[in-house]
Structure formats: structure tokens, C-alpha cells
């Protein structure tokens, strides 16, 4: 099953996505896309890693090249999040650059083929308007392209607002 969980900053989307994973059986993979730039980032990553360990997640770092990820066994994968991955692929010199959306979608297809459930967390884009230029505009367009394409293929699309899940496609399981 493919699920897209969208929401604004601090909307509760990540917590909701984790709750979906905790309803499943079998291996649980947390695919972390945040790049570690400094000690503060490293501390944040370690804190989150410890929190997920109690929930029986195996954490896999994948800030770039999602199509290179190989899951050890079928199970449920939680990708956190498309916003970081899009920025990394667009702007990291080792990333896909202008082909970021295409590379991410290819990676999502690869992941979907490897697991029973793929739950993807992403940021809501363009709800504050669509008049952005330069790097910001390119980033938002790439993320919107990935969101739209994955939503079309997903079994469930849910937006989390103030911690409340609202289903646009599929039903809560």
C-alpha cells in the first residue's frame, strides 16, 4: 500500500505517519533524508534515532539517490521527508540537479517494489500562493511535481491539519 501524508510545518504529519507504521507487522524502516551539516543536526538525528529504536524502526540514511536504497526484507518503509530529499537532490553537488523530481520518482518506484507498505511524508506546497522565483520556485515546483505524481499512484492521500488527518483518497486503516 502506498500512502502520502502531507501537511504544513508542525502539523503533526510525521507523528501521524509514524502511527500508521506502528499499526503494521513485520520489519519497519525509517528512511531519513536530512543531511547532517553540523553538530546541532547530528544531535537532532541521534535524538530521533533513539526515539524510533523503541518503536522497532531500523533507520537508514538516504539524503540522496533514493534509487540506491535496498531494504533487507519486505516490510513497511516510512520516508521522512520529500521536502528534504528534493532540496538535497536539487542543490547538493552530488544530487540530480534539474532532474531531481524524476530521480526521486524513480527512487519511490524502486522502494515501492521492495516493501509491503510505503508511507511518504511531504510538505504541503503552494497553499500560500504560487508566485515564487529563482531557487525557491524551482524547489517548490520540483516538490509539487513529486507530490502530484506520487499522490496519483498512491492508495491513500492524507493531509494532516493541527494533528487531525483528513483523507482525500482512500480511507484510514
What are these regions, as identified by a protein language model?
Residues 2-72:
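Conserved P-loop
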Residues 10, 35, 83, 125-126:
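Short, glycine/serine-rich, charged loops/turns that create anion-binding
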Residues 12-18, 76-77, 110-118:
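Short, functional N-terminal and low-complexity linear motifs
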Residues 17, 48, 78, 123, ...:
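Residue-level signal for inorganic ion chemistry
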Residues 47-49, 77, 137-139:
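Short, hinge-like loop/turn segments at secondary-structure boundaries
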Residues 55-100:
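Helix-adjacent hinge/juxtasegments
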Amino acid at each position: 500500500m502506498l500512502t502520502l501524508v502531507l501537511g504544513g510545518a508542525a502539523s503533526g504529519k510525521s507523528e501521524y505517519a509514524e502511527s500508521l507504521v506502528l499499526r503494521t507487522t513485520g520489519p519497519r524502516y525509517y528512511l531519513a533524508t536530512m543531511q547532517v551539516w553540523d553538530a546541532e543536526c547530528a544531535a537532532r538525528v541521534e535524538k530521533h534515532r533513539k526515539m524510533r529504536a523503541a518503536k522497532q524502526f531500523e533507520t537508514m540514511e538516504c539524503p540522496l539517490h533514493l534509487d540506491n536504497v535496498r531494504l533487507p526484507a519486505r516490510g513497511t518503509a516510512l520516508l521522512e521527508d520529500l521536502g528534504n530529499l528534493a532540496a538535497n537532490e536539487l542543490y547538493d553537488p552530488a544530487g540530480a540537479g534539474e532532474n531531481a523530481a524524476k530521480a526521486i520518482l524513480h527512487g519511490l518506484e524502486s522502494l515501492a517494489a521492495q516493501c509491503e507498505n510505503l508511507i511518504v511524508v511531504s510538505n504541503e506546497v503552494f497553499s500560500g500562493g504560487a508566485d515564487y522565483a529563482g531557487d525557491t520556485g524551482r524547489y517548490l515546483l520540483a516538490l509539487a511535481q513529486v507530490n502530484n505524481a506520487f499522490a496519483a499512484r498512491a492508495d491513500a492521500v492524507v493531509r494532516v491539519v493541527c494533528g487531525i488527518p483528513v483523507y482525500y483518497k482512500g480511507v484510514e486503516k
